[in-house]
Design a protein with these regions (language model features):
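Active-site entrance/lid segments in N-terminal catalytic domains of soluble metabolic enzymes
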Residues: 1-214, 220, 250, 338
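Alpha/beta catalytic cores of nucleotide-metabolism and tRNA/nucleoside-modifying enzymes
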Residues: 73-87, 150, 154, 192-223, ...
């Protein structure tokens, strides 16, 4: 599949979260045929050496971590570290995909462009293409930003047909879909905003298809959040996604920077935290999680193998054909005939 002109074997992107992606993970994911996105407003650009900070986050109790993270993330972003991290990824053969908020794009767009990032993700809760920013920052015009940046820009996150279509018309190289479904996200509880992911993906996929018919330009949509197993990924593509972005499955990799923990990037908000830190553990290497061989029976290892096998079972030769398979809403599929798995906490009963 292709995103922003970049061809990848695996339609899986690792989320721009500090417990998931650092330079090493971004490089390794690229070598394995996938992609990781480095958050340019996280620890990697606030600290020359983020490892002691990551150790602190992994060591504190449930009652202490929000206050600690608010303190740690209060350190200013250093523009020179933005340049350094992008160059570190590229010099090691990785794909320099990076993420910023709209406010961050306004502040650091020039530095990102000068450093030569390969792909930029602007991620926020999107309800229109004009974003309000703090008084000290000029509001970001997404269409103008996409036009002026020398590399492709992916925009999100949205959950409706109209907003997805607006983002495509603004010049998005890809549209991110999902508000609140992530394992470490609490936006739905804090803000009351969101749409179930399958519905959001289907609606935004319809916008993509209509825009492609109207303009001749096919803009991939990426389902971001709420996907834990290979089966989740397969179902999301069946609903119309071109690719997926996942966090917690990769946070469980031995190479992940989170030390077995995963947290939402809005967790350190000084005024209104909208994420939490969860203990996901360490279950295998990055290669085992992405390409196998699987050592777990719950669908969280060999995600690529699961997608290929599902496609073969359904007779889909490629992702486009996978998007055309029948989708049925059937909650009983998760429990039907699984009485022993549930009783013994095995497989699908975990």
């Amino acid at each position: 599949w292709r995103i922003g002109g970049i061809e990848r074997e695996i339609p899986i992107i690792a989320s721009a979260m500090d417990g998931v992606i650092d330079v090493k993970m971004a490089v390794q994911l690229a070598k394995l045929g996938a992609m990781g996105v480095l958050n340019l407003e996280g620890l990697q650009t606030r600290y020359e050496d983020p490892n002691p900070v990551l150790d602190k986050i992994a060591s504190v109790s449930k009652t202490e971590f929000v206050t600690l993270m608010q303190d740690l993330y209060a350190k200013p972003i250093q523009p020179e570290l933005i340049t350094q991290r992008i160059k570190e990824i590229k010099s090691q053969g990785g794909i320099a995909a990076v993420s910023v908020t709209p406010a961050g794009a306004s502040r650091f767009g020039d530095a990102i462009a000068a450093a030569g990032a390969d792909l930029v993700f602007i991620q926020a809760t999107v309800v229109s293409t004009a974003h309000l920013s703090p008084d000290s920052i000029t509001p970001l015009d997404l269409a103008q930003f996409c036009q002026e940046m020398p590399m492709p820009v992916a925009l999100g996150n949205c959950v409706t047909y109209d907003v997805a279509l607006s983002l495509m018309k603004a010049g998005a190289a890809a549209v991110m879909v999902g508000i609140g479904p992530g394992a470490a996200c609490t936006s739905r509880g804090v803000l009351g905003v969101g749409v179930p992911q399958a519905t959001a993906v289907a609606d935004c996929a319809a916008a993509r298809d209509d825009y492609a018919q109207e303009s001749g330009n096919y803009i991939p949509i990426v389902a971001d959040g709420g996907l834990v197993t290979g089966g989740d990924i397969c179902k999301c593509i069946a609903c119309g996604a071109d690719g997926v972005m996942i966090g917690s499955p990769f946070a469980r990799a031995a190479e992940a920077p989170g030390r077995g923990y995963h947290w939402g990037m809005a967790t350190p908000s000084p005024l209104l935290p909208r994420g939490t830190r969860i203990d996901v553990g360490t279950t295998g290497t990055l290669e085992q999680i992405l390409r196998g061989p699987a050592q777990l029976d719950d669908g969280t290892h060999n995600l690529l193998g699961a997608l290929r096998t599902s496609m073969g079972t359904l007779g889909a030769k490629n992702l486009h054909e996978m998007q055309q398979v029948d989708v049925v809403i059937a909650p009983s599929l998760l429990t039907e005939g699984k009485v022993y798995q549930k009783a013994q906490q095995l497989g699908m009963g975990k």
